[in-house]
């Protein structure tokens, strides 16, 4: 049996079958003590993939105006995957964070700034020492306005990289959000439960310029 190259995307026909039963989800976010699934009427949702979801989730829950965050899987084929399945490279999912936020306090543009400035968006199917398609950089949009803002921010960050003598091409994917599958309970708010746990999050020292 040939080993799987986890840095290569797979086709749907090669994906694991998954299951019809969703992962159990805790009722409350352990940091904010809000619902893990409900989105209040005045709130919005954003989804970002920027490497290991442990550090990415903490980055967002620490911001003002955040109602809840959740670690999960998106962008692949396998329904209701497990962490082990995602790590196998046979689901095509990315590790991601679902952010429920109050746009009156923190804007989507501010979330994009956090995204770009806190990881390396030009590493393809890896993030630092974390190697595999699950660690790819991606923005999953839920509205046309998010799509437009994300695309514009990519162009601004690419230009900022060039101006900082970084000629690499950004590999971040910007796609409409498909199903978001919650990760297992031990991955939710992981770095709150394990303050000394692994966090691979880190930017490249480039700031996102504001829109002109």
Curated annotation (Swiss-Prot):
Composition bias type Polar residues, residue spans: 1-14
Cellular component, GO, one term: cytoplasm
Keywords of the record: Oxidoreductase
Superkingdom: Bacteria
GO function terms (MF aspect): L-methionine-(S)-S-oxide reductase activity; peptide-methionine (S)-S-oxide reductase activity
HAMAP family noted in UniProt: MsrA
Entry function: Has an important function as a repair enzyme for proteins that have been inactivated by oxidation. Catalyzes the reversible oxidation-reduction of methionine sulfoxide in proteins to methionine.
Listed name of the protein: Peptide methionine sulfoxide reductase MsrA
């Amino acid at each position: 049996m040939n080993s799987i190259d986890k840095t290569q995307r797979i086709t749907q026909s090669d994906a694991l079958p998954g299951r019809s039963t969703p992962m159990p989800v805790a009722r409350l976010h352990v940091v904010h003590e809000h619902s893990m699934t409900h989105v209040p009427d005045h709130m919005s949702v954003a989804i970002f993939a920027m490497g290991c979801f442990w550090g990415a989730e903490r980055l967002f829950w620490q911001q003002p105006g955040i109602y809840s965050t959740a670690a999960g899987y998106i962008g692949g084929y396998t329904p209701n995957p497990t962490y082990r399945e995602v790590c196998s490279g046979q689901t095509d999912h990315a590790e991601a964070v679902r952010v429920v936020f109050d746009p009156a306090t923190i804007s989507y543009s501010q979330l994009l700034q956090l995204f770009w400035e806190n990881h390396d968006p030009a590493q393809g199917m890896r993030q630092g020492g974390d190697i595999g398609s699950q660690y790819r950089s991606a923005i999953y949009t839920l509205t046309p306005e998010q799509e437009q803002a994300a695309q514009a921010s990519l162009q601004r960050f690419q230009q900022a990289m060039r101006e900082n003598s970084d000629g690499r091409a950004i590999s971040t994917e910007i796609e409409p959000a498909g199903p978001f599958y919650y990760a297992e309970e031990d991955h939710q708010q992981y770095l709150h439960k394990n303050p000394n746990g692994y966090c691979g999050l880190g930017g490249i020292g480039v700031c996102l310029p504001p829109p002109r």
